[in-house]
Amino acid sequence: MFTPTTNNAIGGATAATGAFAFGARPATTTAPPPSFGAATSTPTFGAAPATTSLFAAPAATPAFGAPAATPAFGAPASTPGFGATSTAAPAFGTAAATPAFGIPAATSAFGAPAATPAFGAAAATPAFGAPAATPAFGAPAATSAFGAPAATTAFGAPASTQASAFGAPAPAVGTVAPTFSFATPATSAPTTAPPAFGFGTTATTAAAAMPASLSSGIGSFSFPKPQATTAASLNFNTTTTTATAQPFNTGLKLGTTNATTTLGGGGIFSKPAGQAAAPAASTFVGLGGIDVTATQPKLGDNKQDGIKIKETQVPDEIIKTVDGLKAYIKQQKTISSDIGRTSTSKFTNVSHEITNLKWALQNMATLVEGSNQQIRLMRQETVKAIQSLEMAQRTQDTPAGLQFENNAPFQYFQCLVAKYEQDLIAFRQQIALTERHMHAISNPQSISPDDLKRGFRQLNESFISLAGRLHEVHQRVEEHKEHYLNLRRYRLRDTTNVFERIDNPPLPTVEPQRISSGPTPFSNISALMNKSYAAAASSASNATGN
């Protein structure tokens, strides 16, 4: 049998009443805990024989290391077993007059308050799973044992008036301590008791916890919002800061009310000291510096339209450009409508005026051409008159003995006689025409309009036949021309067009003839007269030839 010494606990602090200190000195000798749950009819080594017993019922003689009165599972006994005191010692986790191994005298068992039942059961009703007046291991309860609903906290929850048990967190003021049972959570009160495992330091920090939710029925599997919880620290003379963790939520329902259970972990298995929460994610910014989340619907908006349109804010530069484009398009539409309503009569009038101006220009060109022809004729007549004047002057200046050499007067009179002859012929023709006309007037003939129509038709047909023959001859000439050019191209290897001068005659350059003045004493009159007579003779011959 192990006998504890009188030394103090590690760290020099005496264990407080109701709390467990590592290596604390008990007040008196302790008895070993009873066996798990039930007593046997035959005592074990070092124990007296016992009477008959039932499951979870007290027996006369306990088993090895158990009290004399064998209790039910977690219930006190009346008779101690081998190596135990004569007083009735509680089972594991229950209050007794004599404490168990490592627990001070006149205090509660491991992790439980005084005057409490055994591990997981109550003293009044020792049956398995039946309601009891006190809670299970580590926390006070008013109703149920293991597996039954209770009015207060269950496994691992701290008491409302004492220090926390082994491994149970010490919550702050006004916080709801999560439990590990199937009952509702209990509201704990502030406490300053030292933790169950440590060196007398006060646990003022909390560690992360992961609650597991068990609800009635078969529910969903989710991760609700993180919860800030507190738990006792297992470190040595250190504190930890409050941190949050993602809870673990299940939808398992066992036919009881919803109860949130906390599996508290701290110290060695918790987050490092001084570690803060994760920083918030940066806001996503879209194109143009516009917050994309600003245009998204909020969580509370349940309005659903029939047609969802994706709309985003457009930068001011693009809006200005679009507005300018719209104004330009509107202006162009206005101009187009004005053009569409404009009448084309003005353009028609202008085209008519242009045509009239073209006809007037053609008439003016004809008049100018006639005037030019008259000018040329007058110029020729002026030249002839000058030549005649020079001839007369030279004839007068020539002496009488030399007149046989001067033939200019003879040519002059010859041309003059020829001209008179032509004029007489022309006059005779005019006189004959006049006589016929007068004869026709004096002797009228009956000519009907049909005769005139017939005569004009015959003239028209004759002109058409002549035009057809002329065209036929022209085609033959063109064929001979092409044949000749091909022969020159293939036989003589000459690609030049010999008919180019005929097809495209150069424009004649008309130079104004020099009009000389009368004879002067300083000029060579004989040379001028000879030239003048030669020019006059050539012009006269050309005139007679024409």
From Swiss-Prot:
Disulfide bonds: none annotated. Residues 22-200 are annotated as: 17 X 2 AA repeats of F-G. It is found in: Nucleus, Nuclear pore complex. GO terms for molecular function: nuclear localization sequence binding; structural constituent of nuclear pore. GO terms for cellular component: nuclear envelope; nuclear pore. The keyword Metal-binding does not apply. Keywords: Glycoprotein, mRNA transport, Nuclear pore complex, Nucleus, Protein transport, Repeat, Translocation, Transport. Pfam families: Nucleoporin_FG2. GO terms for biological process: mRNA transport; nucleocytoplasmic transport; protein transport. O-glycosylated; contains O-GlcNAc. O-GlcNAcylation increases with increasing ambient temperature. InterPro entries: NUP58/p45/49, Spt5_C_dom. It comes from the Eukaryota. Sequence repeats lie at residues 22-23, 36-37, 45-46, 64-65, 73-74, 82-83, 92-93, 101-102, 110-111, 119-120, 128-129, 137-138, 146-147, 155-156, 166-167, 197-198, 199-200. Contains FG repeats. FG repeats are interaction sites for karyopherins (importins, exportins) and form probably an affinity gradient, guiding the transport proteins unidirectionally with their cargo through the NPC. FG repeat regions are highly flexible and lack ordered secondary structure. The overall conservation of FG repeats regarding exact sequence, spacing, and repeat unit length is limited. Component of the nuclear pore complex. Interacts with Nup54. Interacts (via C-terminus) with fs(1)Yb; this interaction occurs in a RNA-independent manner. Interacts with sbr/nxf1. Interacts with Nxt1. Belongs to the NUP58 family. Component of the nuclear pore complex, a complex required for the trafficking across the nuclear membrane. Together with Nup54, required for transposable element silencing regulation in ovarian follicle cells. By interacting with the nuclear (Nxf1/Nxt1) and cytosolic (fs(1)Yb) components of the flamenco (flam) transcripts processing pathway, enables export and subsequent piRNA production. This is Nuclear pore complex protein Nup58. It comes from Drosophila melanogaster.
